[in-house]
Every structure is written in C-alpha cells, then in structure tokens.
C-alpha cells in the first residue's frame, strides 16, 4: 500500500531475504574482540526503486556487526560506508518522496553522506536488544517520540574527535587531549543552538 494506515496489512517478501541468505551466508568476521564489520548488501534493483517511487516513505537500513572490545577502523565497511551502501542511499533518495535511513550499528559511523544525499530522517538504533525491532517500529510509526539526548556525540568528520590524531598505536594510548576525553571535549563547547522554542517580545 502507498499509504500506511492503522491496521493495514503489509506484503512482506520473505522469500527475497530467505533466498539472499542462502546465497550469501552470514559473515562471522573474525569474532569477538575484532574490528566491527558489515554484511554483504543486496544490489538495488529497478523493482525496488519502483516501489520507492510509488510509496510515501522508503526505509534504507545500514548495519554493522559489532566486534566487541574494538573501535572502528576508518575504512569502508567499518567506520565508513561501502560503495554499495552509499549507492543504495543515493539511488533511493533520488526517487523517493521521503527517505528514512535506519542505522543498525553499535558504534558511531561516518555521517558525511547525510549532507550529500539529504534523506528526510536518520534514525540511530544502537544496540536495542531483543525489543530493539519493536522500539524502532514504534518510533517510525509515530507511536513514541524519538527525542532525548544522545549517549554519544556524532561528529561531522572523524578528525573532529581529538583522539583521532593519537589513535592506533598497538602498544600505547596517548591522551594528548588531557582530561578532555570523549564527551568532555564536546561538552567544553557551548551548543550552537537551543532546541527549545524561543520568542522575542517586549517587556
């Protein structure tokens, strides 16, 4: 249906995903304690793009398989999007009335593509646990409001993080940013705007 109504029945193409998984089994990567990685993505077909054109909202899901105990590498498939992922976002944004990109990731990732392709919304879902899918559905359908302070600061560029310059030595960590580690660095800057509604008036 082009219009999502309460109680409406949706056609879900289960066989599409089942066939994909058979041909592209889950990649276990290098296991626990390794750098996060990504699974192989489907190529966007003309049939998919036609669905995106006809419907009110298109969802694009980007995922990372967290590798516990490791930070991202500044490489495609880890911190950066792969060419396939970026192409998927670009092509859907070009034809869809409204595009929502859902980031099913456990770490922050590069967000430079947002300015490039201008999706109408981006939803970071982090590690939602067994109820994560239901929580995402509640946000996307408007059952709950997606508001609140993020647990992480997502910088526009990886070089905006002060630790980037000194990161990557396999034997030592250099905290040249002193006590301004992580959120403390960003909290030392005043926010550029207040998200509350403001009015100017005369006393």
Question: Where do the protein language model's features map onto the residues?
Answer:
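C-terminal non-catalytic regions of proteins with extracellular/luminal or membrane-system context
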Residues: 1-203
């Amino acid at each position: 249906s082009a219009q999502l109504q309460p109680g409406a029945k949706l056609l879900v193409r289960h066989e599409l995903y089942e066939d994909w998984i058979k041909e592209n089994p889950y990649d276990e990567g290098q296991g626990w304690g390794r750098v996060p990685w990504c699974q192989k993505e489907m190529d966007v077909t003309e049939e998919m793009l036609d669905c995106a054109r006809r419907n009110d909202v298109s969802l694009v899901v980007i995922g990372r398989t967290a590798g516990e105990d490791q930070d991202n590498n500044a490489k495609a498939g880890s911190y950066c999007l792969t060419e396939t992922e970026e192409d998927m976002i670009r092509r859907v944004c070009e034809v869809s009335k409204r595009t929502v990109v859902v980031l099913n990731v456990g770490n922050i990732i590069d967000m430079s593509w947002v300015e490039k392709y201008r999706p109408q919304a981006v939803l970071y879902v982090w590690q939602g646990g067994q109820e994560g899918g239901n929580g995402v559905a509640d946000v996307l359908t408007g059952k709950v409001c997606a508001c609140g302070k993020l647990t992480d600061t997502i910088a526009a560029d990886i070089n905006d993080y002060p630790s980037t310059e000194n990161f990557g030595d396999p034997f030592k960590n250099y905290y040249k940013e002193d006590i301004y580690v992580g959120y403390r660095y960003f909290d030392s800057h005043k926010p550029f705007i207040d998200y509350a509604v403001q009015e100017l008036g005369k006393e």
